């Protein structure tokens, strides 16, 4: 029987598979206890959600109302997410019944998800399209907060920017939340510019409404020993040089590091001493899983956009307008280069990190290089 894989990614990571962040965990726990609203800002797959769950595990007698806002498109979507999160907050169905009762004006219906067996609440879409309906669902949170010690997490909060009534939605949310002074709201987001705009723009209703807690890459001195120990748990021997090579390949993004280490584990046997020779087989496994997606993503690009992407893979993203880069990318002008970059960012293929453009998925970069484009 094959041993359980010691690396986890693409999900909330808890227990032994979670690499501790003691300072951040301690800060977040103290903010939650104090009812201090917090903004968690970090790039994709840095472990923000896992950090929140680790903080929750350290809090006795606190409930967490976790609301995932990814891909919301309407006010009705937002209301449904909050109501469903409230209904699922406890093991007992009393939360679902109370959620239905407290939101009676929105004509909610209760169903059971056939896969998870968890309750799902849907409000009347016509009633919920009025941004003022958000006040009803926040009032639901307020009622629960009076009865339970809880904190609220809005994950992927930048998705609110997608709503047609964005400004009104933010204003109503802020207007209700500011009176829940004993309840901590954690706003987590992976699109840094959008989160910064919501919480630092003087014109935003959420201006200076929460403390910012940055979630950077794990320090090498913490993450490397953790990974070496996890490999040892899987009967593989990794040294610091190998781990450093993994860091360089993945831009030190927590989730991508775990994914690559998982692929290494899959392509090696017990007792293996890991070296550079194990990198290519692990990449081939990832390409087998994600190659069709990479092909689809690049097939939609124009010639200029594709050439720009390949040049970024070859030369990196710091000297975009240098003569060498422009020649490699075959860009006719700086305007054409800027236009191609804008499209690649909009498509979620790259993002700006400081003054450097990086691949959202570092394995797309290595895939492009492996193809010899």
Predicted ranges, named:
Residues 124-192, 200:
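Conserved Walker B catalytic segment
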Residues 197-248, 269-272:
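Helix-loop-helix "sensor" segment of P-loop NTPases
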Residues 243-249, 255-269, 307-310, 342:
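C-terminal helical "lid" of AAA+/P-loop NTPase domains
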Residues 76-83, 220-228, 322:
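An amphipathic alpha-helix signature
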Residues 266-289:
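Conserved C-terminal helix/linker of AAA+ ATPases
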Residues 2-5, 288, 292-373:
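C-terminal leucine-rich, beta-strand-based interaction scaffolds used for sensing/assembly
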């Amino acid at each position: 029987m094959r041993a359980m894989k010691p690396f986890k990614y693409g999900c909330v990571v808890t227990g032994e598979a979670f690499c501790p962040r003691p300072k951040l965990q301690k800060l977040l726990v103290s903010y939650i206890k104090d009812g201090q609203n917090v903004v968690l800002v970090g790039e994709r797959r840095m472990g923000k959600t896992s950090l929140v769950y680790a903080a929750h595990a350290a809090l006795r007698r606190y409930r967490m109302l976790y609301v995932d806002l990814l891909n919301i498109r309407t006010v009705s979507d937002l209301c449904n997410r909050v109501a469903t999160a409230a209904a699922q907050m406890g093991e007992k169905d009393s939360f679902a019944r109370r959620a239905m009762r407290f939101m009676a004006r929105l004509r909610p219906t209760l169903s059971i998800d056939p896969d998870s067996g968890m309750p799902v609440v849907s409000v009347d879409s016509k009633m919920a399209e009025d941004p003022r309906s958000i006040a009803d669902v926040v009032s639901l949170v307020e009622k629960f907060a009076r009865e339970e010690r809880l904190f609220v997490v809005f994950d992927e909060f930048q998705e609110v920017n997608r709503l047609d009534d964005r400004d009104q939605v933010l204003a109503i949310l802020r207007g209700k939340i500011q009176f829940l002074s004993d309840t901590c709201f954690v706003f987590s987001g992976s699109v840094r510019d959008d989160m910064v705009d919501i919480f630092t723009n003087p014109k935003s209703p959420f201006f200076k409404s929460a403390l910012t807690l940055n979630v950077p890459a794990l320090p090498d001195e913490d993450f490397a020993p953790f990974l070496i120990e996890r490999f040892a748990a899987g009967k593989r021997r990794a040294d610091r040089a190998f781990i450093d090579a993994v860091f360089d390949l993945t831009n030190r993004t927590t989730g991508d590091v775990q994914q690559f280490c998982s692929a290494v584990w899959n392509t090696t046997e017990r007792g293996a001493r890991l070296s550079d020779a194990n990198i290519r087989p692990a990449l081939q496994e990832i390409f087998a899983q994600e190659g069709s997606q990479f092909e689809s993503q690049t097939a939609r690009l124009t010639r200029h956009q594709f050439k720009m992407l390949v040049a970024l893979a070859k030369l990196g993203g710091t000297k975009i307008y240098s003569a060498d880069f422009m020649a490699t990318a075959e860009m006719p002008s700086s305007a054409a280069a800027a236009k191609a970059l804008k499209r690649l960012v909009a498509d979620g293929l790259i993002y700006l990190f400081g003054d450097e453009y990086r691949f959202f998925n570092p394995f797309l970069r290595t895939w492009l290089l492996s193809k010899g484009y």
